[in-house]
Amino acid sequence: MDAVNFSILAPRYGSHPMMSAWSGIGTSDMNGGAFNWGGIWSGIKNFGSNVKNWGSRAWNSQTGKLLRQKLNDTKVREKLVEGISTGVHGALDIANQEIAKQIERRLERHEPLEPEVEEETVETKSEAKAPLVVEMPLKRPRDEDLVITADEPPSYEETIKTMAPLVPMTRPHPSMARPVIADRPTTLELKPSDQPPPYSPQSSNMPVTAPVRSRGWQGTLANIVGVGLSNVKRRRCF
């Protein structure tokens, strides 16, 4: 019963589970077992070394020397180089031809430009306009003489006689002015009452006080240095 239950987990050889033979696990006897890659690599190396030895022997042999001499005489190298160069130039020529064909195809796709038709310009002559007629006024005859008359201004004496006597007026404007009636002519002299009073300096009523000298060292210092200027504050209204 236990073998049946664990047979699914056991390694298999094909379709048969391996329940007892555990020694064969991981060997080439199993399906998909180990593979010796080292042997394959060593075989490849041995085959390569053998090919190299065979080639060197053939190259250094008398037959190889004769073959090389024959190749030099027939100029095989030059022919190979010429063939390669001609092939390269031919490939370049083919590429240039293909590019030219592509350019021509793209140019053919565009619609051809229509030639510009020059428009015939017809010069239209402007109709001759009728000349303008301007009527000029008739000129006066030269025999006529112009006579200009002008009234001469009156003389100064006549003007003074016709003028009214100069009388002082009450208003500056002539329409508002009225004559001032007085026995004596007015003058610009000021009245005695209008004259300003004579200037008289005001005498100060402040008593003059002499500085009081203190006794002791303060008085001695005042005698040496002096009391200086007296400062008097006065308030005046202008």
Swiss-Prot record:
Residues 187-212 are annotated as: Disordered. Transmembrane segments: none annotated. The record marks G33, A34, V227, G228 as: Cleavage. It comes from the Viruses. The gene is L3. Pfam families: MCPVI. Residues 36-53 are annotated as: Involved in endosomal membrane lysis. A motif (Nuclear export signal) lies at residues 67-76, 219-230. Residues 228-238 are annotated as: Binds to importin alpha/beta, involved in hexon nuclear import. This is Pre-protein VI. Residues 1-33 form a propeptide. One of its GO terms (cellular component) is viral procapsid. Residues 48-74, 221-227 are annotated as: Interaction with hexon protein. It comes from Canine adenovirus serotype 1 (strain CLL) (CAdV-1). N-terminal amphipathic alpha-helix domain is essential for the membrane lytic activity. A motif (PPXY motif) lies at residues 153-156. Residues 34-54 are annotated as: Amphipathic alpha-helix essential for membrane lytic activity. A motif (Nuclear localization signal) lies at residues 233-236. Induction: Expressed in the late phase of the viral replicative cycle. All late proteins expressed from the major late promoter are produced by alternative splicing and alternative polyadenylation of the same gene giving rise to non-overlapping ORFs. A leader sequence is present in the N-terminus of all these mRNAs and is recognized by the viral shutoff protein to provide expression although conventional translation via ribosome scanning from the cap has been shut off in the host cell. Belongs to the adenoviridae protein VI family. Keywords: Capsid protein, Cytoplasmic inwards viral transport, Disulfide bond, Host cytoplasm, Host nucleus, Host-virus interaction, Late protein, Microtubular inwards viral transport, Phosphoprotein, Ubl conjugation, Viral capsid assembly, Viral penetration into host cytoplasm, Viral penetration via lysis of host organellar membrane, Viral release from host cell, Virion, Virus entry into host cell. Ubiquitinated by Nedd4 following partial capsid disassembly; which might play a role in intracellular virus movement during entry.
